[in-house]
Amino acid sequence: TGATQEIAEEMDKIRSSGKPIIISMGDMCASAGYWLASKGNYIFASPATITGSIGVYMDYTNVEDLMDKLGIKNEKIKSGAHKDILSMYRPMTGEEKEMVQTMVDDIYNQFVQTVADGRKMDENKVRSIADGRILTGKQAQDLGLVDAMGNYYDALSYAASSGGIQSENIPVKSYGTGVSLKGILSGEARNLSGVFGKALADSFKESVAGSSVPSMK
């Protein structure tokens, strides 16, 4: 959620600068994905795109009974009564469940408000469909969560038109997702010198240009 909101803040800055943000949902754009999509000026989806899932949930596993059967005891030293509130070794108290529910509700309300503001929808209407349900792109369009049916190229064309670009050869700059440790270990980055060299060069070019592009994963 934190990462989603950080990206959303950058999207707000882009929109505030006067640059339109056009969204192409692709196969799936649900939950946090829709949180971000709702920040766009115009949203394209395919009829069978999986989207929606507006809501928040938190779960945890309690293995207390299993530990008892195995004869394993968990001992802890903590600074406060609720420091281990989501520990798998004990159940939550009624008070703690209320605490967690309050936190979930707070994030949920932020989600609903974000969608209502971004889509210019009545908050109560958003709440009526913000029960975690998933939707197809077509269903989302009927509910006002998506603007039009279309693919990546439709979105690209619309973005060019919104930016006053009339040429058939629309200039597009793609940004990679970076290289993770998992990717390195799995062989995703087969040429590390090339990968890191390119990253360094890109960083230098961005520094010279005085701009910075956030990396979104």
Language model region names:
Residues 36-41:
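Alpha-helix C-terminal capping segments
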Residues 48-56:
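Active-site loop architecture of trypsin-fold serine endopeptidases
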Residues 1-31, 42-46, 58-217:
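N-terminal organellar transit peptides
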